[in-house]
């Protein structure tokens, strides 16, 4: 690692970090150096430096990092949408905005979103959506942490859905449970949205099941412990590997630092 990068993010080799963390710090350092040479905005550079310092110190993201994640999420979504034109990843900064998008029944469509779960709160979740011409949408929500932590917000979301979308919209909620810190939700949401895109045939089948008989399980499967999170495309530790997103893209490098 070059001296300039060490000054920005610290020297991970001097600490007892795992090879995986060392690799992430090195790759993020490369992305920062590339972004600096490209003249990227100072606010985005500061975001990258803050994330890199947390990684190098081997500490969990905090509320400051979460605020930076939220602030830069539209840029991050745009970056991924350029790379994957059919992804259609959106930032829904309020439940109301999410419902507005779900009310569009003009055409068939598939898109993903990282959604603020409740007004006035910072917690975000991932959603994979199918809209249908003249019919209600189906929505698969992926919670990175624990449902019970946010149970009041989920009850409100469902109640608001009935009022704004009617009773025909079909929802499925998957508790992935991979998030262990209090401030990783945005980046886990991004990764789950990307995993849903990568596993498109599986999610298409789940949406069809949800549309036709109200559950993502196959018809006739009444198992109470049916947990699609076991599918490798959802809960794999590395939904998108570093090799698939070059470290020269600072935004995409940042999206991988917390959940891989």
UniProtKB/Swiss-Prot annotation:
It is an enzyme of class 2 (transferase). It comes from the Bacteria. It catalyses: L-threonyl-[protein] + acetyl-CoA = O-acetyl-L-threonyl-[protein] + CoA; L-seryl-[protein] + acetyl-CoA = O-acetyl-L-seryl-[protein] + CoA. Its EC number is 2.3.1.-. The keyword Metal-binding does not apply. One of its GO terms (molecular function) is acyltransferase activity. Transmembrane segments: none annotated. CoA binds at residues 123, 180-181. The active site is at 123, 143, 185. Keywords: Acyltransferase, Plasmid, Transferase. Belongs to the acetyltransferase YopJ family. Serine/threonine-protein acetyltransferase translocated into infected cells, which mediates acetylation of serine and threonine residues of host target proteins. This is Serine/threonine-protein acetyltransferase NGR_a02610. It comes from Sinorhizobium fredii (strain NBRC 101917 / NGR234).
């Amino acid at each position: 690692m070059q001296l300039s990068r060490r000054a920005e993010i610290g020297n991970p080799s001097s600490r007892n970090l795992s090879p995986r963390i060392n690799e992430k710090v090195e790759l993020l350092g490369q992305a920062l150096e590339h972004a600096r040479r490209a003249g990227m905005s100072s606010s985005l550079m500061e975001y990258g430096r803050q994330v890199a310092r947390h990684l190098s110190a081997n500490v969990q993201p905090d509320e400051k990092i979460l605020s930076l994640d939220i602030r830069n999420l539209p840029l991050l979504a745009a970056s991924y949408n350029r790379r994957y034109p059919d992804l259609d990843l959106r930032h829904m900064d309020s439940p109301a905005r999410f419902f507005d998008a779900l009310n569009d029944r003009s055409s068939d469509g598939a898109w993903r979103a990282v959604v603020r779960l409740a007004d006035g709160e910072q917690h975000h979740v991932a959603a994979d959506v199918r809209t249908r011409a003249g019919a209600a949408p189906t929505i698969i929500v992926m919670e990175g942490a624990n449902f019970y932590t946010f149970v009041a917000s989920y009850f409100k979301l469902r109640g608001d859905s009935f009022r704004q979308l009617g009773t025909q919209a079909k929802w499925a909620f998957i508790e992935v449970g991979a998030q262990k810190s209090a401030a990783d939700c945005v980046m886990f949401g991004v990764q789950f949205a990307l995993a849903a895109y990568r596993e498109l045939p599986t999610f298409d089948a789940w949406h069809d099941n949800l549309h036709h008989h109200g559950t993502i399980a196959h018809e006739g499967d009444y198992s109470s412990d049916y947990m699609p999170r076991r599918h490798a495309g959802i809960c794999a530790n590395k939904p998108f590997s570093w090799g698939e997103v070059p470290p020269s893209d600072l935004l995409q490098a940042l999206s991988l630092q917390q959940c891989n």
